[in-house]
């Protein structure tokens, strides 16, 4: 996954949208944005199936609404490694990838870092 951005970070319908949503079909591969260690691969309410990866120095990424996990907590992953498959789990209206970046636990706009 990682095609066209279909929803940006920021206010959306009066609610702060904490990440970027990418167009994806159920089963499309989801790749790690950077190397790191898998913190969790669980179902978490509205996020549905979510993977969190700790990249060090306070940087954590989240990949949500997945249909399948390809990694488990404690796994080391490389940049570009398949970590799961896109889906429509949790609170969403269609399959897509929700991607979040947190720095020291605070949601940040991923665009600022992906463009560097």
What are these regions (language model features)?
Residues 2-116:
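Catalytic cores of peptidoglycan-degrading enzymes
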